[in-house]
Amino acid sequence: LRQAGAPLTIEEIDIDDPGPGEVQIRTTAAGVCHSDLHFIKGLHHTSMPCVPGHESAGVVEAVGPDVTYVEPGDHVITCMSAFCGVCRNCTAGRPVLCESTEHWRAPGQPSRLSQKGQPVTQLYNLASYAEAMLVHERACVKVRHDMPLDRGALIGCAVMTGFGAVVNTARIPVGASVVVIGCGGIGLSALNGAAVAGAGTIIAVDVSSKKLAAARTFGATHVVDASVEDPIAAVHALTKQGADFSFEAVGRKETVEQAYEMIRYGGTTVVIGMVPQGQKLEIDAEALLMEKTLTGSNMGSNRFREDIPQLVEFYLSGKLHLDEMVTARVNLDDINEAFAAMSAGEVARSVIVFD
C-alpha cells in the first residue's frame, strides 16, 4: 500500500534476517479483514509504504538468537497483540493491552522490511500479505499440526475478536439475551461465541439476507433485517425490555448508538468494530444513570497463548464453525478483488492462500 485510496500492488521487497527474539514465518494463509480496509481507505493511518495483513498462519522457517518458544517446522498462528509479560497490564492478566514496545525494532535498527534500502512499514508489526513474515516470537502461538492453517488464520483476528468479546470482555452468563450487529467474520464469531457460552436468545442484525441466513448456522435464534424494519424496535419486541448484551461489529457511529439503544437497563454494549478515527458517539446521558454500560473490546480481550489453542480445540471438536466462515480462497494477485467483494458484502471471509 503506497497511499490511502490506491489499489494494493504486488512488489518484491527485502526481508531482514531474524534478530534477537524474532521468527521468520512462511505464510500459508492470510484472511482479508476489514481492519486492513480501514487503512487502505484512509480511515485509519500508518506510515507509507506499508504491507498490510494481520490475520495469518504459517510455518516457522528460521529463528533468531534467544528464541526459545518456537523452532523451524512449527505451525503457528500470528497475533497483533504481542506482549512483554512484565508491564502493568501484562502482569494484571491483560496482555492485549501491553504497554511495551520491546517487540518492535528500536529506532536506529534496520527495518524488518525494506525496498531499495528504504524502510517498509509492517502494519500491526505483522505484514502478512506477503510470502514471508518476520515477527517477534511473542506475536505468534504454536498450534497442532492437524489444524488446517487456511482456517486457523482466521482465529488470529476475526474469530478471537468476536468470540473473545463475548466470552472474555462481556463474560455473558448462561441464558443471557444477546444481539450482534453486523454478520461479517467478526460478527459471526460473536454469534458462535454466544452459542458456545450458552446464551438464550441470540439475535443477529444485518442488511444482507445472505449474511442473516449464515448467522443462523453460527447460533442466531432470531434475525433482523435492518433494511426492512427498525432494528431497535425489533430487538425490544423479541426481548421485551431490551437485550442483556449487544455487540457492534460494523464500526459505524450509527450502529454503535443503535446497539446502546437495544439493551435493557443494566445491560452492556460492547463495541468491537473500528469506528473511524475522530468520530464522536452520542448517547442519552440519562441512560447511564440506569446503569447501561458502553465499553470497547480490543482483540476480544485475549490472552492469545491460552485462547488460540482453546479455539483450535473448539474447531476440531465441531463447536467453532470456521469451514462455514470461509466464503472464498484466492491468490495474492486477487487481493484487490477480494477487498472489493468484502466491501460489497458478498463474502463473510476471503482467505489468501499461498502456494
Kindly give the residue locations of the regions a language model identified.
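Glycine-rich beta-strand-centered segment in the early N-terminal region that forms part
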Residues: D16-A30, L43-T91, V96, K142-D146
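Mid-domain Rossmann-like dinucleotide-binding core that forms the NAD(H)/NADP(H) cofactor-binding site
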Residues: P72, E131, R138-C140, R144-E229, ...
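Cysteine-cluster motifs in flexible loop/terminal segments that predominantly coordinate metals
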Residues: C79-R138
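C-terminal hydrophobic helical "lid"/dimerization subdomain
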Residues: E257-E261, Y265, A287, R305-D355
